[in-house]
């Protein structure tokens, strides 16, 4: 047992433990930056979206079924992760840059939020050129709600998104729930269906604007004849 008295034995042991810990940390960091641990989104059916209850944000709110948003002319809808998030404000501004083209197509632009805290929606409105509604039951964030917790802060893609939005001049706050991931939908008129469904996979994972515009061009507005069918 003389080797136990050899200082080099303990030094080598500590180096081995340290190397093992570093290797495990490196592997964890590597896996955290892949999609291995990301929850897979469950696609929403049109019938699921149609039945969602939304509320207007007036002093006397009106509750209505979400299908009213797209029944006649289709719609582009942003499910906002958190109005105070500067990444969400960046995406809202990006979508709003399509507003004039969407207007030419006759397709409205909307957003839904999952909570209405103090002036958060009011402060978000300058970034978004469309009406905003409240989805209290968070249905637009389902059918299977997905969360990104603190793992998001060790993902390189998230940090890239942070710097991109920051360099773009966007700022925000930490008010409200921000772990349930959002998304963007392009829904056709009537029973045309969901033409685009983008589910945020990490903080700041923005929808492709060209894809939104291409999907919006596929919308076929309801006519009196089609409404009677």
UniProtKB/Swiss-Prot annotation:
Induction: Up-regulated by CSF1 in peripheral blood mononuclear cells (PBMCs). This induction is reduced in the presence of TNFSF11.
Keywords, comma-separated and alphabetical: Antioxidant, Cytoplasm, Redox-active center, Secreted
GO molecular function: antioxidant activity
Pfam families: AhpC-TSA_2
Region described as Thioredoxin fold: 14-112
Tissues expressing the protein: Expressed in CSF1 and TNFSF11-stimulated CD14(+) peripheral blood mononuclear cells (PBMCs).
Main location: cytoplasm
Gene Ontology CC annotations of this record: cytoplasm; extracellular region
Biological processes annotated in GO: regulation of osteoclast differentiation
Active site: residue positions: 85, 88
Superkingdom to which the source organism belongs: Eukaryota
Localization (cell): Cytoplasm; Secreted
Stated role: Involved in redox regulation of the cell. Acts as an antioxidant. Inhibits TNFSF11-induced NFKB1 and JUN activation and osteoclast differentiation. May affect bone resorption and help to maintain bone mass. Acts as a negative regulator of macrophage-mediated inflammation by inhibiting macrophage production of inflammatory cytokines, probably through suppression of the MAPK signaling pathway.
The family this protein is said to belong to: Belongs to the peroxiredoxin-like PRXL2 family. PRXL2A subfamily.
Note: The active site cysteines correspond to the redox-active cysteines of peroxiredoxins.
Protein name: Peroxiredoxin-like 2A
Source organism of this protein record: Homo sapiens (Human)
């Amino acid at each position: 047992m003389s080797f136990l008295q050899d200082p080099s034995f303990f030094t080598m042991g500590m180096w081995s433990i340290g190397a093992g810990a570093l290797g495990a940390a490196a592997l964890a960091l590597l896996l955290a930056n892949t999609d291995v641990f990301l929850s897979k989104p469950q696609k929403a059916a049109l019938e699921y979206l149609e039945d969602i209850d939304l509320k207007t944000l007036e002093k006397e709110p009106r509750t209505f079924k979400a299908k009213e948003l797209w029944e006649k002319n289709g719609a582009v809808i942003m499910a906002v992760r958190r109005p105070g998030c500067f990444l969400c404000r960046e995406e809202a501004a990006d979508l709003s840059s399509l507003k004039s083209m969407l207007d030419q197509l006759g397709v409205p632009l909307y957003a839904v939020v999952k909570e209405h805290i103090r002036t958060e929606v009011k402060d978000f409105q300058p970034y978004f050129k469309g009406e905003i509604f409240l989805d209290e039951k968070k249905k637009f964030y389902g059918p299977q709600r997905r969360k990104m917790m603190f793992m998001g802060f060790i993902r390189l893609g998230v940090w890239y998104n942070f710097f991109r939005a920051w360099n773009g001049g966007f700022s925000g706050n930490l008010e409200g729930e921000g772990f349930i991931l959002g998304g963007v939908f392009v829904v056709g008129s009537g029973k045309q269906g969901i033409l685009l469904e983008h589910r945020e996979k990490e903080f700041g994972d923005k929808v492709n604007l060209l894809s939104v515009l291409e999907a919006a061009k596929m919308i076929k507005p309801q006519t009196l004849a089609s409404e009677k069918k």
